[in-house]
Amino acid sequence: MLEFYGKRFESRLLLGTAQYPSPSILADAVRASLSRTVTVSLRRESGEARAGQDFWALIKALGVAVLPNTAGCHTPREAITTAHMAREVFGTNWIKLEVIGDTDTLQPDPFGLVEAARILCDEGFEVFPYMNDDLIVAERLIEAGCKVLMPWGAPIGSGRGLNNPYALKTMRAHFPDIPLVVDAGIGVPSHAAAAMELGFDAVLINTAVAKAGDPAAMARAFALAVEAGRLAYEADPIEARDMASPSTPLLGKAFL
């Protein structure tokens, strides 16, 4: 079972809530995905006390855990301020920490990310850092107090899948006891299955579902892919080989 900061979840699929055609389609997608955790941007939704009341009511009705994020923040100070606002609005210590370093690729700023993570962890936040696939950055984030890591598969919204499977596989091997979530770049269910087959604990999907022709159907497809990938990983799949290996035994073969 998936576990984040002492909270346990049946589903290993996290779902973003941005870019859906309508609130009802979002609700249908969340239900179809079987996800129990959704991410919410404070910059887009304003919680109970302001204009986002309808959205907030929808999320509450779905009965899912809320993971606020600091999307759009480019400095540690901005991310920290947003995290504090999110804690007040959404009533949770969870924060998906994003400190963006490049506007073209939306690549995270590793230096600002570690700085902000250290401060937020010291202030009692339970931080989910959106990061690249660098092992040293991962180590620094863990030292800062993060108990979950969220490396990207590819740039946000690109749909490219896993740009560097080797780096992700290495990270999994290096941190066997840390929950790892592939965040960003997933485009189709097979990408999610591939991440799960590498041993990742979960995947976070937004654009690939929200922008699909049928978001609810795509959400269901991702749910099945995540389940299949996890089952495959737990089944201990065979290693790839360069040469053929006969699957049919030669015992009993007729010799002419």
Swiss-Prot record:
This is Thiazole synthase. GO terms for molecular function: thiazole synthase activity. Homotetramer. Forms heterodimers with either ThiH or ThiS. 1-deoxy-D-xylulose 5-phosphate binds at residues 157, 184-185, 206-207. Its main location: cytoplasm. Its EC number is 2.8.1.10. Belongs to the ThiG family. One of its GO terms (cellular component) is cytoplasm. Pfam families: ThiG (PF05690). Keywords: Cytoplasm, Schiff base, Thiamine biosynthesis, Transferase. Pathway: Cofactor biosynthesis; thiamine diphosphate biosynthesis. Catalyzes the rearrangement of 1-deoxy-D-xylulose 5-phosphate (DXP) to produce the thiazole phosphate moiety of thiamine. Sulfur is provided by the thiocarboxylate moiety of the carrier protein ThiS. In vitro, sulfur can be provided by H(2)S. It catalyses: [ThiS sulfur-carrier protein]-C-terminal-Gly-aminoethanethioate + 2-iminoacetate + 1-deoxy-D-xylulose 5-phosphate = [ThiS sulfur-carrier protein]-C-terminal Gly-Gly + 2-[(2R,5Z)-2-carboxy-4-methylthiazol-5(2H)-ylidene]ethyl phosphate + 2 H2O + H(+). The active site is at 96 (schiff-base intermediate with dxp). InterPro entries: Aldolase_TIM (IPR013785), Thiazole_synthase_ThiG (IPR033983), ThiG (IPR008867). It is found in: Cytoplasm. It comes from Brucella suis (strain ATCC 23445 / NCTC 10510). GO terms for biological process: thiamine diphosphate biosynthetic process. HAMAP family: ThiG (MF_00443).
